Regions:
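Hydrophobic faces of well-ordered beta-strands that scaffold small-molecule active sites
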Residues: 2-6, 25-29, 54-58, 94-96, ...
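Active-site-proximal loop/turn and secondary-structure-junction residues that shape catalytic pockets
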Residues: 8-10, 31-35, 58-62, 98-102, ...
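Short amphipathic alpha-helices and their capping/turn segments at secondary-structure boundaries
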Residues: 36-50, 78-89, 116-126, 184-194
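Glycine-rich, phosphate-binding/catalytic loops in enzymes
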Residues: 21, 45, 72, 111-113, ...
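Histidine-acidic metal/acid-base catalytic patches
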Residues: 16-17, 76, 90-92, 102-106, ...
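N-terminal pre-domain/capping segments
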Residues: 1-84
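A general structural motif
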Residues: 1, 22-24, 49-53, 86-93, ...
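Active-site acidic/histidine proton-transfer and metal-coordination neighborhood
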Residues: 71-171
C-alpha cells in the first residue's frame, strides 16, 4: 500500500491528493498535541472523507527509553491517550521513534535501554492488543562520547536486538530512507528479517531535506520501484510536503481516480 504523510497544517492538501489519485491508499498523520487530534477529527467527520484509511505517527518527542520513572509514566499515558482517542478510525498502524538518552549512559548500559524500549512497547500492546507498532530508524550528528543526548535507533543492531527481545508479530520496523542516508547505515538485514514499512524521502546526506524523486539522475522512478521490489514493504509512505509529494506521484505515474 502506498500512502502519503500529513501534519495538521497540510492535512487538507494531502486529503485532496488522496482523492485525486486512486493509488494513494492511506494517510499517515503525525500527532504531537491535542489540537492535532482535533484537526484530524474535523476532517474525518466529513462525509467525503469517510473512506480514508489512516495511520498514526506518534509524537516526535515520544521517549521509549526515558529512565526517570515519573516522566516515563507521563510519556506512556500521553501516548496511550492518543491511541485511545483515534482508535475509532481503526488506524492501520502506529509509528514511533525510540527516543533519546545521554550518550555516556546509553553506551555504558546499552541493553538496559533496549529493554526499556521493549517494555514500553509491550505495555502498549497489552493495553491495545489489536494495534500494530512500527519503530523508526533516526539519525544523529553526535559521534563521540559526551554528556549530550543521543538519538536511539540510528544503527541496525539496535533494532535487531529489540525485535529479538520483543518477539512480537505486532511490532515491525519503519525504514526511513532519508535518515539512513544521513547516518550512512545499511538496514537491509533488519528489513529482510522483520515486517517492515518504508518512509520514502531523500536528501544530500547532510540534512533531513525530505526531497522527492527526479526525472533524471540517481533517484528516479526506476530507483523507487527497484527498492520496492527488493524488499516488499508492508506500507510505503511518501514522507514529503504537498508539492514534492505531487511531483513524485506524477513521476511514479500513479493512477488518478
Amino acid at each position: 500500500m502506498i500512502g502519503i504523510s500529513a501534519l495538521s497544517y497540510d492535512l487538507e492538501q494531502k486529503i485532496s491528493l488522496f482523492h485525486e489519485y486512486k493509488d494513494i491508499e492511506f494517510i499517515e498523520y503525525g500527532i504531537d498535541e491535542a489540537t492535532d487530534i482535533e484537526a484530524l477529527n474535523h476532517h474525518m467527520s466529513k462525509k467525503e472523507n469517510k473512506d480514508i484509511k489512516i495511520s498514526i505517527h506518534l509524537p516526535l518527542k515520544t521517549n521509549l527509553v526515558e529512565d526517570i520513572g515519573f516522566l516515563r509514566d507521563a510519556n506512556f499515558n500521553y501516548v496511550s491517550n492518543i491511541i485511545r482517542e483515534v482508535s475509532y478510525l481503526k488506524p492501520l498502524y502506529f509509528n514511533t521513534h525510540l527516543g533519546n538518552v545521554f550518550y555516556s549512559k546509553y553506551t555504558s548500559n546499552y541493553k538496559n535501554y533496549i529493554q526499556k524500549a521493549n517494555e514500553f512497547i509491550q505495555r502498549l500492546l497489552v493495553e491495545y492488543p489489536n494495534i500494530n507498532i512500527y519503530t523508526e530508524n533516526v539519525y544523529s550528528f553526535l559521534n563521540q562520547a559526551s554528556s549530550d543526548l543521543c538519538a536511539v535507533g540510528t544503527k541496525p543492531i539496535e533494532f535487531m536486538d529489540l525485535f529479538e527481545i520483543a518477539n512480537n508479530k505486532s511490532l515491525g520496523f519503519c525504514f526511513d530512507l532519508g535518515h539512513a542516508l544521513i547516518q550512512d547505515e545499511d538496514f537491509s538485514n533488519v528489513i529482510k528479517n522483520y515486517n517492515s514499512m518504508l518512509h520514502f524521502n531523500l536528501n544530500d546526506k547532510t540534512s533531513d531535506q525530505h526531497l522527492g524523486l527526479s526525472k533524471t539522475g540517481k533517484y528516479t522512478k526506476k530507483f523507487f520501484y527497484e527498492l520496492i521490489d527488493k524488499y516488499g514493504f508492508s506500507y510505503i509512505v511518501l514522507e514529503l510536503d504537498s508539492s514534492k509529494a505531487k511531483e513524485t506521484i506524477e513521476i511514479l505515474e500513479l493512477n488518478k481516480l
